[in-house]
Amino acid sequence: MAKDKTTLPPTGAGLMRFFDEDTRAIKVSPKGVIAIVLVLIAFEVFLHLFGPSIFG
């Protein structure tokens, strides 16, 4: 009965192939992401403070 068992492929086989593929996407460093978020937060605070006087 033990001879009828089928073996499964290793679980990491698909992961290695996934990370080896190159995609055509915009690549942003972690520092760039943090900078973009900080700029958006500053813009939001600016609009919150001065938006009513600027836009009526």
UniProtKB/Swiss-Prot annotation:
It is a single-pass membrane protein. The keyword Membrane applies. Its main location: membrane. GO terms for biological process: protein transport. One of its GO terms (cellular component) is plasma membrane. Residues 1-29 are cytoplasmic. It is found in: Cell membrane. The chain crosses the membrane at residues 30-51. It comes from the Archaea. Keywords: Cell membrane, Membrane, Protein transport, Translocation, Transmembrane, Transmembrane helix, Transport. Residues 52-56 are extracellular. Component of the protein translocase complex. Heterotrimer consisting of alpha (SecY), beta (SecG) and gamma (SecE) subunits. Can form oligomers of the heterotrimer. Involved in protein export. The function of the beta subunit is unknown, but it may be involved in stabilization of the trimeric complex. Belongs to the SEC61-beta family. This is Preprotein translocase subunit SecG. It comes from Thermococcus gammatolerans (strain DSM 15229 / JCM 11827 / EJ3). The gene is secG.
